[in-house]
Amino acid sequence: MQNCACNVEFQFDNSAEKLVSSLEYMLGQITGNIPPHADKDDILFRCKVIITELLTNAIKHAGRGSTRFDIEWDAEKLIICKTDTGMPLYLVNTRNNTTNGKADLNKRLISADFLNSLYAIWENENHIRFASEEGSLDDFRPVEQVMEHFGILIITRSSDEFTYTYDKATRSNVFRVKINF
């Protein structure tokens, strides 16, 4: 493990055929850079889940062209960024919400089931942080209401921080995942 901040860039062509080889490549870049004090198996499992979900998201939503992945690390953390261009995540335009009759412009429940509630928390107009809270059997909802945003939940639960930013000037969608060592 190097003591400096390091970065690897990877272009993914958004094809299902390249998902496994792309996942293996990115995990290979991460494997040798996990510091000795970190739980290597835990970090690699979380990275595998997160990267698989980000690659799948690119195939489903990024459209033509390619998606850029940046992997950055230092002695304290690992950052995985996925950047594509196009329309913003639909949540950017759904900020207004009412909770218990009171307007809550910064936090919105976007999905829930008996295990988890998933929230979008607006840091500003185009920047969303995701958070989840564990549910209980008392919170059980009918099957029709079970997680619509399961991929976002998977990444949120597997990371220490998960954010989304839409850059209007470049029409870029940036999904940023942080894992602490």
Name the predicted role of every residue range.
Residues 2-6, 59-181:
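Conserved beta-strand-loop-beta-strand hairpin that lines the nucleotide-binding pocket
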Residues 1-49, 60-61, 67-83:
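Bergerat-fold GHKL ATPase/HATPase_c domain
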Residues 52-57:
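Conserved polar catalytic motif of the HATPase_c/GHKL fold
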